[in-house]
Regions:
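Catalytic domains of riboflavin
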Residues: 1-183
Length: 183
């Protein structure tokens, strides 16, 4: 097993600005899971394919509440009973510029549109293959989740406040935990 190394925040921000993916792990007392995280505005088809092939979890796109409201993205359910209150909205796809909706290129295109503050609701159809998540106001200060971390990191990188996350799942189906990520 290789030794796990935690990177300083300035390196993480530089990687996100360069369009790279980083790993964010939450507290062992919460979900104790690790996610691949990228900046939505810079996400590439290659990064989406990497997330699908090696992350293996759901690929989701955290956004700020103002963005969800501007795009008329209603909650997936009117009463969220999930333990961590993950705020899924209705799923979306780009209305134009895609062919299969699910390919890495099509998902990256939809996610980039979602992150672009100049794109309005008419650019999307519902339901779709992209799962936006509405981050909590004040980010990780109020809810220490991957959703808020992705939005906060994008902001710190000077990018639109939108991320892309994918839980890391091992080939056997167990979740990636901090202690076993080096395996």
């Amino acid at each position: 097993m290789s030794e796990l190394k935690f990177s300083p925040i300035d390196e993480i921000i530089a990687d996100l600005k360069a369009g790279k993916l980083v790993i964010v792990a939450d507290d062992p007392g919460r979900e104790n899971e690790a996610d691949l995280v990228g900046a939505a505005s810079l996400i590439s088809p290659e990064s989406i394919a990497f997330m699908a092939n090696y992350g293996r979890g759901l690929i989701c796109t955290p956004i700020i509440p103002e963005r969800a409201k501007a795009l008329d993205l209603s909650p997936m359910t009117p009463k969220n009973r999930e333990a961590h209150k993950t705020a899924f909205t209705i799923s979306i796809d780009a209305a134009e510029g895609i062919t299969t909706w699910i390919s890495a290129a099509d998902r990256a295109h939809t996610i980039q549109l979602l992150a672009n503050p100049n794109t309005d609701a008419s650019a999307f159809v519902q339901p779709g293959h992209i799962l936006p998540l509405e981050a909590i106001e004040a980010g990780d200060l109020r809810r220490a989740g991957h959703t808020e971390a992705a939005v906060d990191l994008a902001r710190l990188a000077g990018l639109p406040p939108a991320g892309v996350i994918c839980a890391i799942m091992h080939e056997a189906g167990t979740m990636g935990r901090v202690g076993d990520l080096g395996e």
